[in-house]
């Protein structure tokens, strides 16, 4: 297996070998010194040279004065050299270098074990993590307070000094000018002069100008050399040549233009993976386009099939609705025909009775006319007008020729003609549906969607018949009437907060009923008009017919004219 030094390049500059330190020298000397006996066999042995102390320090079991490395020896020169010590594993303890100059009670982290948390160490069980007691807290607090006081006293800038205790001095007067004062003594009390702590300073401190800065570090440069022609050519930068502007009209050679371009300085190499990548992208795009086209075509077919099925369902529903409507019309027609037969039978009997008894017929006509007149007076103008309109509507061409249709319906040829007409109608409808399907198949997608949307918007009556009419679902603000938001009904409510409605619920309905309901004043005018029209004889000026039609004045007609086929 090759080492890492074989893989590294050779050094460019030779490096001198490291100086052998004192620790290495001592270790070598300790390895070579075998004259020190083992522990427990040093009773008669005494260290005689400094080589005997190279294994550590002094020997405590030998009770003589020992000076390892001449430390503490009388007459020796003091030194700041650190004494080498060994740890429990026998290796040199270099933590003394970090703890040099610090107090003895200061904890300095000097090993890798200090970086490991206490809970993750091997000896975690031996380390006490209990909360300190009151005595330890008190001693720590006192030490901290003393340190603060010492620091504050050192940083006192006011210049005031602490008050000192007064001093008492015994003063004995000397004999002067022939007086005897040796016996007189005084006790003098010496105190400091009180000083105002807010007094401004008496002296002005001026800043001492700083020393001149050290001279800058010298920059070592190689001696100037003369440029060669090759250097000048390498450092030559061609002037800029524009490929778009030439305002002066200079003629620039191609080599200068290419030199100014700068694109020929590097060889451009195009990786062939770009071409492969583009080809793969194009192939994937083509595949995806084909898949999307097939999916779109399939979705279009499914949509067309669903639309066709929906149209078939609607067409079937419409056909059923038409059939039900035709069945209902036929049943109604049959009922009407039966009613007509009954009416005709009753009219024949009435005519026979009238022909047998003319007097009774005249009295019957008078009573009927009187009853009709009284009924017309009791009716409102609105009812009379609606009655007239309904009567005019009932006089349709179909009712005029009811006798002809009844006679035709009873013939077998009419049934065949009706069935042929129905088959023709169904055939035309199927033809129209086939033509419509053909047009839809030839239409494009957009036109087909428009056509389907147009056909879906059927008439509301047809949608109701098909059961496809659905109320429009409103959303947003369209659900509420905006006129309700701008109303303030406090005045109309009488300032009553509990009354939420300002108007009655059926107020509009009462107004509508009052509009379309005839009043008592209008009834009298309408009755007078009806009486005047009934009593007026506007055709008397033309003369009176001498002979009327047979059975014409038997009774008043109250419905449409019905013709009766003569029985052969």
From Swiss-Prot:
Residues 199-232, 281-449, 545-568 are annotated as: Disordered. It comes from the Eukaryota. Residues 286-364, 395-419, 426-440, 557-568 have a biased composition (Basic and acidic residues). Belongs to the SNW family. It comes from Yarrowia lipolytica (strain CLIB 122 / E 150). This is Pre-mRNA-processing protein 45. It is found in: Nucleus. GO terms for molecular function: molecular adaptor activity; RNA binding. Keywords: mRNA processing, mRNA splicing, Nucleus, Spliceosome. Pfam families: SKIP_SNW. GO terms for biological process: mRNA splicing, via spliceosome. Its main location: nucleus. GO terms for cellular component: post-mRNA release spliceosomal complex; Prp19 complex. Residues 365-379 have a biased composition (Low complexity). Involved in pre-mRNA splicing. Associated with the spliceosome.
